[in-house]
Amino acid sequence: MVAGLEEVRRRSLLYTDIDDDELVRQHSPLMSPLVWDLAHVGNFEDLWLVRALGAQDATRSGLDDIYDAFRHGRASRAALALLGPAGARAYLREVRGRALDLLDRFGPLPDDPAHSLTIPHALPVGIGIATEPGAAPPVPAGTSPTGTGTPSGAAARATEGSPLDADADAHDRLLTRGFVYGMVIQHEHQHAETMLATHQLRAGPPLLDVGATPAPGRVVPRREVLVPAGPFTLGTSHDPWAYDNERPAHRVELPAFWIDTLPVSNRAQMAFIDAGGYDDPRLWSPAGWEWRQQEGAHAPAFWWRDGGIWLRRRFGRIEPVPPDEPVQHVCWYEAEAHARWAGRRLPTEAEWEKAATHDPVTRRSRRYPWGDTAPTPDHANLGNRTSGPAPLGAYPTGASPCGAEHMIGDVWEWTASGFTPYPGFRSHPYREYSEVFFPKSGETSAFRVLRGGSWATGVPAIRATFRNWDYPIRRQIFAGFRLARDAE
């Protein structure tokens, strides 16, 4: 646990090791000033590891309101009385010191469950919702990489004390299998990805070093695979670090469908552009066409054409667009229009998860496409090792049982599904992570689900059941898509 906390803190400090002026500036109304994110992860850690577990007073009073994502939207946070860069770093050190002192009280705790957990995700035919005795309760955590969820909503605490004051059993549930530490670790990884999105949006020369060269791709023609009809297990009831919206595991019957083995490439998006896809209203939904006209979009965000060459801006550097990488920085409406142009559609999130996890031989769902072991650099492109997507075909050992590749890492993948609760959903430990984003009865979801994580996602903060969500207009996120179709 200590190693996990230290690893993600290194990421946070690395992405904020820049001039103070850059830290306090609001680079886009879509994002917070980086100094807000920095102090916010400390406030979240203070809330859960110091106050909730240790029943201690707040490390510093007067900060909960300022760093409450529900009370203050991103566009307004620069006007708050934020801690300055030096103050934010000092606050993080103070909180971490107290959290580690308290950790010693609770004895040995498990490491990231991805390294040791065997997850029995098989559901015998005839079983509906899985509610195994002794399963760890749901674990919501921090702000989603896309910026929709929040880890510290106002309703999570009425004062600057513990959010668990009224629940005598909640303390023990937080410690079960160490999941409160997993919650904090994942939350900070999610904010690290948010910080990278802010860096991508800022203007000016580069501030971040370029990551390692990604694994080489291989020539893989566009191919689709048939996923047979039948039941599979959607979600999880066993994973101790899973958020509440991933729970509970339940049996889902799906008809057969085809899905591409690879995400859509930059080359394919260029073909869509050259075919007039951005200018043909027949390819767009009414809401999508309205967005396209208002935005004036003619290509993915950060792209432009110079003569016959497509260029992009990546963290302040100008470079040609690599044709064989997965396309990223496209919104859901762009993905939907491309799919319609290609005579295809986006997969539902249930289809995506079945293609990613279901093993027809064992009739169980895996934690990752390749199995239950934690991702390595041979499996997937994660953790900002490369500063961007890897070429398609770079990770054959990360393929799922059906042969789909790049299902984890590289780009978040838009799905056709709105963000709704699973049958038997129970919010825990508070409503503001997921429940408040679900549609009210009789309404449709304003959000679309994304799956799989990106090259910027921390390893502890992704698994095949992970559900991200955002508005269909979002482009600053590291998102792409893959195509599917009904089986004839």
Regions found by a protein language model. Give the residues of each.
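A structural signal for short hydrophobic/aromatic patches embedded in well-ordered alpha helices
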Residues: 269-272, 355
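Short regulatory "switch" loops immediately downstream of catalytic or recognition motifs
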Residues: 104-113, 236-237, 358
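Disulfide-stabilized, aromatic/cysteine-rich ligand-recognition loop
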Residues: 1-32, 36-43, 47-61, 65-98, ...
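A conserved hydrophobic secondary-structure block that centers on an alpha-helix together
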Residues: 174-175
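Residue-level detector of short coil/turn "hinge" positions at structural boundaries
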Residues: 57, 131, 152, 279-280, ...
